[in-house]
Amino acid sequence: SEMCIRDSPYKHAKGEGNYQWNTGYEYYLYGYDQRSMGYIDILVPTSDSDGQIVRIICTHFDHCGIDQVIQQQEQNVVTQAGLNNPEYPTILMGDLNVGWGTNVLPEFRNLGDHIGVSWVDHIFAFPKGRWTGHDFKSHSCPAANGKASLSDHDPITATLVLK
C-alpha cells in the first residue's frame, strides 16, 4: 500500500545536488526502480591561485530497454544539472544502460564530449570542446575471498584535462 511505501526505510537523500525520478506511486505498482542523479562541485587546484570549480555527476539510468525512458532520464539530468549552459566545467559518469553505438543519448552527445564507454558505463564531459580525455580503462574487480562481487560492473577511469 502507499502507507508501506511512505514508511519504507529505503529512501534516497534528496537536497541540493541530489535528484530522483521514478518516484511516483504508480512506479512502485509496476516494479520500476527508483533512479537518481547526484552531483558535487569541487574546487580543483590549478596554477591560478583561485583554482577551478568542477562539477562531477554520477547517475544510473533504467535498464528497461525502452529508448523513450532513457531519453526522458537524460533530459532530467540535462535540466537538473544545467548541462545546456553549465555553471562549471562538468564530468558525467554512470551506468546509462545503453552501449557505445547508440543514438539514444542525443542531448549528451550534442552538449558534451563522449570520453569513453565500457559495456553500458559512460563518461561524458561538458561543455563540448572544453576537455580532452585519454587513458579510458575498465578495471577488472574479481570477487575477493570467494565472496560475491560488489557490482555487476567493473569500475571505469579516465584522465580528463580541462583546456
Label each PLM-derived region with a short phrase.
Residues 81-91, 96-163:
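Metal-dependent phosphoester-hydrolase catalytic domains
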Residues 6, 33-35, 70-75, 116-117, ...:
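A structural signal for well-ordered alpha-helical scaffolds and beta->alpha junctions
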Residues 26, 61-67:
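Second-shell loop/turn segments in exported
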Residues 12-14, 58, 110-112:
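Structural signal for conserved beta-strand scaffold positions within catalytic alpha/beta enzyme cores
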Residues 34-57, 67-105:
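His/acidic metal-ligating clusters that form di-metal
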Residues 1-2, 6-53, 135-140:
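Structured beta-strand-rich core segments of catalytic domains in phosphoester-bond hydrolases
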Residues 5, 63, 98:
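Active-site micro-motifs of SAM-dependent methyltransferase domains
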